[in-house]
């Protein structure tokens, strides 16, 4: 994938949740919750303040992050699903460990 997000945007590959319940029932797509975790695939250069100072994002490529449930724009690139998020507003936390 060759995508470079602009500004403070981040490209995320959502992590899919289990498609079966603990009792073994297969969940249809309509019953699945939207993923809220994903892996950072690409990071924009950050935001520019009015003074001209560049503010880089705290996340980097390879980080696993938790993001707002209905945030971002879903896109399909090379047949794969991705979400483009505002890296400052939509990403809530970096998963460590």
Swiss-Prot record:
Keywords: Chaperone, Cytoplasm. It is found in: Cytoplasm. Pfam families: Cpn10. The keyword Plastid does not apply. GO terms for cellular component: cytoplasm. One of its GO terms (molecular function) is unfolded protein binding. Its main location: cytoplasm. One of its GO terms (biological process) is chaperone cofactor-dependent protein refolding. Heptamer of 7 subunits arranged in a ring. Interacts with the chaperonin GroEL. Together with the chaperonin GroEL, plays an essential role in assisting protein folding. The GroEL-GroES system forms a nano-cage that allows encapsulation of the non-native substrate proteins and provides a physical environment optimized to promote and accelerate protein folding. GroES binds to the apical surface of the GroEL ring, thereby capping the opening of the GroEL channel. Belongs to the GroES chaperonin family. This is Co-chaperonin GroES. It comes from Symbiobacterium thermophilum (strain DSM 24528 / JCM 14929 / IAM 14863 / T). The lineage of its organism: Bacteria, Bacillati, Bacillota, Clostridia, Eubacteriales.
């Amino acid at each position: 994938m060759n995508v470079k997000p602009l500004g403070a945007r981040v490209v995320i590959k959502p992590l899919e949740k289990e498609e079966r319940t603990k009792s073994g029932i297969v969940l249809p797509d309509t019953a699945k919750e939207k993923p809220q975790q994903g892996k950072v695939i690409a990071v924009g250069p950050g935001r520019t303040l009015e003074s001209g100072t560049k503010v880089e994002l705290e996340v980097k490529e390879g980080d696993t992050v938790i993001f707002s449930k209905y945030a971002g724009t879903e896109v399909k690139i090379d047949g794969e699903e991705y979400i483009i998020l505002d890296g400052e507003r939509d990403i809530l936390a970096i998963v460590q460990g």
